[in-house]
Regions:
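Short, exposed "boundary/linker" segments that immediately precede the start
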Residues: 1-3
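Selective transmembrane helix interface/packing segments
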Residues: 6-224
Length: 224
């Protein structure tokens, strides 16, 4: 919501972590060889992430599948947390999606960027890693460095922009209630539709985030 300060972001981010950990822990208890119920859902999500990133990571898919599974579930949950309730005062927003805050999305982007560069050095060695910046020829060095910076920024801004704008529109729809008693049913109906659409957008953005993350990591660890 424009102009409204978020005062509970650390708590909501921690809540997202607790929800993800709790659901995964609960779903993975008493696992059987033939999955069923909650285990089946958990394995389906893991296989979905695994198949999504395999094209970018190739033979290294298994090395990063668990990491990107955790990131996918965290981002998806964080994207949709703000859809559950609306708790705010004139100056503070007490309940919002953590990923509607740029600080959260840039932190996630920095984590992926740091991992990709560390893994690139580990897999190719420092000389092999630096050689990538001189490809296809040394004059491309400034452009290759700029590309890394734009990748970092775009990964954060894409997620932040989509989730933040969704919450702004949700707030505007809910304000229809204050206009007139006759606007309340319209506001309620529009809000239901928009919440459903926002949940879908939250999934798409989590999906795009792990695709781009796997691309950035794969670009560093795969052979040229």
């Amino acid at each position: 919501m424009t102009g409204v300060q978020t005062c509970a972001l650390p708590i909501l981010s921690l809540l997202t972590v607790i929800i993800v950990f709790g659901v995964v822990f609960w779903s993975s208890r008493k696992m059987t060889i033939k999955p069923k119920g909650k285990q089946n859902v958990l394995e389906f999500i893991y296989e979905f992430v695994n198949s999504t990133i395999s094209q970018s990571l190739g033979k290294f898919t298994k090395n990063y599948s668990l990491l990107l599974f955790v990131i996918f579930t965290f981002v998806f949950t964080a994207n949709n947390l703000g859809l559950l309730v609306s708790v705010k005062s004139e100056h503070y927003n007490f309940w919002t999606s953590p990923t509607s805050n740029f600080g959260v999305t840039i932190t996630l982007s920095l984590i992926i960027t740091l991992i990709s560069h560390i893994e690139g050095i580990r897999k190719k060695g420092f000389k092999g890693y630096l050689k990538g910046y001189l490809s296809p020829y040394p004059a491309m060095l400034p452009m290759n460095i700029l590309e890394q910076l734009t990748n970092l920024a775009s990964l954060a801004l894409r997620l932040f922009g989509n989730i933040y704008s969704g919450e702004v529109l949700t707030g505007l729809i809910l304000k229809l209630v204050t206009w007139s008693v006759f606007a309340a049913p319209v506001s309620f109906a529009l809000n239901l539709v928009w919440v459903a659409f926002s949940a879908f957008i939250g999934f798409i953005q989590a999906y795009v985030f792990i695709i781009l993350s796997s691309n950035y990591i794969g670009d560093k660890v795969n052979e040229e």
